[in-house]
């Protein structure tokens, strides 16, 4: 493989689309806490001074949509009208109905293991050994930059920062291996009083340098810090936000394929979400077992049918055992039926709001990040 560049981006928790994702998942968590069998498809729209929460929810639980919304916006940091969005005064509108009975009859079963998929679709999972969390480096470090932005904003290190921010990192590869970072973009919302020179110096010293490994930065690395020169108007005042519009940020930063389905606001019966988590779990365990350096899993479903319609394993020529054997191992050690994967990953808990910013993958405390099957796979493959 020749030398090449690869770029991924991330956005902060204060980005309008991420506000929407977090509200949708906060509603989901509140419902699952009371009713683990609830059916939830919650969508959120945010714009200056307003939040609209809609979707289809079937549950025995009662939750206060307005309170959940305000608390979520408050935690993100939009608490003053001079930011163009204020948790205390924004309008909160609700337009929620029930899940179609036509879908229910295809999902619910007397035998839970025969629970059908909530929709047709295809999902991908991916892992690579180029980082400690078995994720692609570009998206991993893009996430870490905006996480650091939120950290120094909230702890008062840089009090003039505001919640909306974006990052982008371009890595240099040579024969598939990282050799450096070519370019870094970081744009952060800020208050009026900070001048651009001071902002750029502070962002470099407090955000970029503590996060990006020095050995990957060279005199040729280009830094773009607030390249428009001003970013005071941001958040929902700058752009409207919608649930499910950051699906590449949520996954692998473009390094792997994507089936098209968003995650946030969906309960685990929706395979768009749960099967994508399971596919990551499978791919990560294959790489952790040393059966491949890179692994991409595709799984697909028909609505109302329990068994996947297909399972594909792609290892990009890095496999240590034949690909056909890998597929057999996946079928043997992982139950990818909707109920099976819910049980395998213990998904019927309020764990989703935290996934809604800084990526659904690569953070070790999520259950789909476990590598508990790596040794089983290695032994079954006959590797010493």
Curated annotation (Swiss-Prot):
Enzyme Commission number: 2.5.1.6
Q: Does the keyword Metal-binding apply?
A: yes
User: Can you state which reaction this protein catalyses?
Assistant: L-methionine + ATP + H2O = S-adenosyl-L-methionine + phosphate + diphosphate
Q: Where does L-methionine bind?
A: 56, 99, 239, 270
Tell me which residues bind K(+): 43
List positions binding ATP: 15, 164-166, 230-231, 239, 245-246, 262, 266
GO biological process: any one?
one-carbon metabolic process
Q: Which UniProt keywords apply?
A: ATP-binding, Cytoplasm, Magnesium, Metal-binding, Nucleotide-binding, One-carbon metabolism, Potassium, Transferase
Please name the GO terms that the record assigns under molecular function: ATP binding; magnesium ion binding; methionine adenosyltransferase activity
How and how many cofactors are bound, per the record note? Binds 2 divalent ions per subunit. Binds 1 potassium ion per subunit.
InterPro entries per record: ADOMET_SYNTHASE_CS, S-AdoMet_synt_C, S-AdoMet_synt_central, S-AdoMet_synt_N, S-AdoMet_synthetase, S-AdoMet_synthetase_sfam
Stored Pfam families:
S-AdoMet_synt_C, S-AdoMet_synt_M, S-AdoMet_synt_N
Which pathway does the protein contribute to? Amino-acid biosynthesis; S-adenosyl-L-methionine biosynthesis; S-adenosyl-L-methionine from L-methionine: step 1/1
Q: Where is this region: Flexible loop?
A: 99-109
Return the GO cellular component terms, semicolon-separated.
Answer: cytoplasm
Cofactor(s) it depends on: Mg(2+); K(+)
Q: Where in the cell is it found?
A: Cytoplasm
Q: How does it assemble?
A: Homotetramer; dimer of dimers.
Q: What does this protein do?
A: Catalyzes the formation of S-adenosylmethionine (AdoMet) from methionine and ATP. The overall synthetic reaction is composed of two sequential steps, AdoMet formation and the subsequent tripolyphosphate hydrolysis which occurs prior to release of AdoMet from the enzyme.
**UniProt family annotation:** Belongs to the AdoMet synthase family.
The identity of this protein, by name, is S-adenosylmethionine synthase
Phylogenetic classification of the source organism: Bacteria, Pseudomonadati, Pseudomonadota, Gammaproteobacteria, Enterobacterales
């Amino acid at each position: 493989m020749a030398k090449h560049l690869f770029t991924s981006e991330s956005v902060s928790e204060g980005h309008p689309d991420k506000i929407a994702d977090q509200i949708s998942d906060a509603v989901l968590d509140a419902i699952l806490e009371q009713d683990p069998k609830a059916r939830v498809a919650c969508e959120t729209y945010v714009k200056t001074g307003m939040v609209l929460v809609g979707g289809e929810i079937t549950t025995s639980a009662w939750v206060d949509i307005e309170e959940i919304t305000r608390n979520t916006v408050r935690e993100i940091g939009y608490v003053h009208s001079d930011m163009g969005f204020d948790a205390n005064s924004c309008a909160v509108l609700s337009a929620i109905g029930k899940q179609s009975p036509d879908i229910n009859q295809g999902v619910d079963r007397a035998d839970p293991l025969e629970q059908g998929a909530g929709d047709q679709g295809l999902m991908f999972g991916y892992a690579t050994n180029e980082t400690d969390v078995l994720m692609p480096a570009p998206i991993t470090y893009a996430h870490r930059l905006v996480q650091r932005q939120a950290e120094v904003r909230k702890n008062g290190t840089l009090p003039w920062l505001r919640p909306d921010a974006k990052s982008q990192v371009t890595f240099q590869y040579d024969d598939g291996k990282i050799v450096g970072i070519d370019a870094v973009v970081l744009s952060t919302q800020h208050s009026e009083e900070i001048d651009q020179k001071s902002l750029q110096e502070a962002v470099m010293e407090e955000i970029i340098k503590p996060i990006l490994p020095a050995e990957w930065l060279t005199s040729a690395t280009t830094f773009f810090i607030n390249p428009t020169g001003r970013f005071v108007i941001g958040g929902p005042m700058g752009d409207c936000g919608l649930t499910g519009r950051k699906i590449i940020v949520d996954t692998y930063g473009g390094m792997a394929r994507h089936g098209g389905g968003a995650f946030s606001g969906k309960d685990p019966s929706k395979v768009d979400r749960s099967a994508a988590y399971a596919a990551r779990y499978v791919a990560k365990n294959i790489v952790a077992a040393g059966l491949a350096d890179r692994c991409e899993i595709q799984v697909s479903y028909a609505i109302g049918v329990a068994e996947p319609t297909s399972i594909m394993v792609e290892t990009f020529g890095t496999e240590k055992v034949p690909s056909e054997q890998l597929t057999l191992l996946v079928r043997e050690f992982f139950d990818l039926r909707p109920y099976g994967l819910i049980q395998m990953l213990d998904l019927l808990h309020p764990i989703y709001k935290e996934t809604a910013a800084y990526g659904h993958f690569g953070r070790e405390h999520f259950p789909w990040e476990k590598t508990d099957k790596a040794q089983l796979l290695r032994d079954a493959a006959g590797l010493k």
